[in-house]
Regions:
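Interfacial helix-loop-helix junctions of multi-pass membrane proteins
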Residues: 34-40, 92-120
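Internal alpha-helical transmembrane segments of multi-pass membrane proteins
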Residues: 71-86
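"…centered on the first transmembrane helix and the immediately adjacent amphipathic helix/loop
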Residues: 1-66, 84
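Helix-loop junctions at the membrane-solvent interface of multi-pass transporters
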Residues: 29-30, 101-102, 129
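Short, charged juxtamembrane terminal tails flanking transmembrane helices
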Residues: 137-146
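Hydrophobic, aromatic-rich alpha-helical transmembrane segments
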Residues: 45-50, 77-81, 108-112
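Membrane-interfacial alpha-helical segments at the cytosolic side of multi-pass membrane proteins
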Residues: 55-71, 117-133
């Protein structure tokens, strides 16, 4: 991948991340009067919890692309991914706490649980990809050294 393409890709990922965060804020704090009834569960899971899961699942993936994470060691990969998870959890908690300050939304611990499960699941995907990259990088370094 060329350097110019890489720079363009990272810039696009950063713009996508900002748009994504804006959309999350809009969905979490928007005042929607004409929404359909969300109380009917799908496979036993309330629809609003599914929406929370879908809404927060992309966070670590888009954030990792926007931050251009390319760790050289396993420990650094774990640390970077942990920071993504902590930031995602903080944003999810802030949205739920913030909803308590509105007169048209109610904060819910179960919404946060749905957010947490999405963040943990996608963080594990990001961690797996980064660990594979570190392993390949170590192999390439060892092969070129010999």
């Amino acid at each position: 991948m060329g350097a110019k393409f890489h720079k363009t890709f990272v810039l696009a990922a950063r713009i996508a991340f900002l748009v994504y965060v804006g959309m999350v804020v809009y969905v979490c704090f928007g005042h929607f009067d004409d929404l359909p009834d969300m109380s009917r569960p799908i496979w036993g899971i309330p629809q609003d919890k599914i929406i929370h899961f879908i809404m927060f699942f992309p966070f670590p993936i888009i954030a990792a692309l926007a931050l251009d994470l390319r760790p050289a060691r396993y420990g650094k990969a774990f640390l970077e991914v942990l920071m993504l998870l902590v930031c995602g959890l903080a944003i999810a908690a802030a949205t739920e706490i913030g909803q308590g300050f509105t007169d048209y939304r109610d904060p819910s611990v179960w919404d946060w649980v749905a957010d947490i499960s999405a963040l943990v699941g996608s963080t594990l995907i990001v961690l797996t990809v980064l660990l594979i990259k570190v392993r390949r990088s170590c192999r390439n370094t060892a092969a070129s050294a010999s």
